[in-house]
Amino acid sequence: MIIANKQIKIYYNDNDNSNTLPVIILNNFEEQINEIITECRHINSKEFILVEITNINWNKEMSPWKITSLFKNEEPYLGNADEYLKVLETEIIPEIEKKIEKNNKKVKYYAIAGYSLSGLFGLYSVYKTDKFKKIITASGSMWYPNLENYIKENKISSKVESIYFSLGDKEKISKNPILKSVEEKTKLIQEYLSNKVKTIYEENEGNHFNETAKRIAKGIKWSLEN
């Protein structure tokens, strides 16, 4: 279905009789819902409802503030995360909730998940809203300039219970000085936030684009258990 010009897909396990389930909101660059669900089943995750949102203006809507492009011919990072978050909270989630209720389900809580820049968006969002109890940031863009300072200078939502961080072990190998800081900054942010909420940092094999659905699924499984 289409809500606010975004493509929305909702997954339910029709064989599960639970009435109240966690709902995971996944902002994604491309449609992967079937791959992610397959991976979740393979690793025996707990039951949940997955909402995948695509057709996102990636560098515009997932970025918290403006920065210059990292590469030639790359779209600029325009810093419209606040505007998109408002649309997510006031337009998209209410419609999703209606759809869930029509299927005789209830929302236990909301979690927010993302990969790469949308992993950054998920973490940033809990400094702006109390909507989400859990965050899954798989290979998240923790390299983003000034992010570490923002996290230290602002207050995370008191509703947050856990945050999952992961990276590929080769992601720090980059000629770009900003991108090559991703592992160092991810670990620093995870360590800082571990004093406030339950966190984990998990390292996977490969670069940024390796087994993305599997990495998201691993984050979902951990989040549902923590």
Where are these predicted regions, by residue range?
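The feature captures the conserved acid-bearing segment of alpha/beta-hydrolase catalytic domains
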Residues: M142-S223
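Gly/Ala-rich beta-loop-alpha elbow adjacent to hydrolase catalytic centers
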Residues: A113-S118, G122
